[in-house]
């Protein structure tokens, strides 16, 4: 997701190839609005934006989000349906997000800098796509190359 959608993505789409996978740090996205409560709408908006741009979102969250989300019944339905993947209780979802991103060579939508995991995942910063949700619209950061410290 480092660049805007271009000819390569259009070619893959026309050939029926699966869209590129992007991991969504669902807990981070849900809590990107004001207040302590997570908002399921933020997750939906980010996923819709990614699909609109030709990507397939995979939402990963920590188990605590189920106690912090505003639309609990709908959230549980999405977890049960596999739309949202929840890390096991008592584990660190960040580890799973970073591990999957490395294994799948995927980008991560998150405003978390994962500084506490920098030693184990030195490539994490180059995988990040920062975002903002403003008045129901999602803006994704566009980068043309890796970040430099």
Q: For each predicted feature, which ranges?
A:
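Acidic, polar low-complexity linker/tail segments
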Residues: 1-18
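Nuclease catalytic cores that cleave nucleic-acid phosphodiester bonds
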Residues: 13, 19-22, 29-35, 40-149
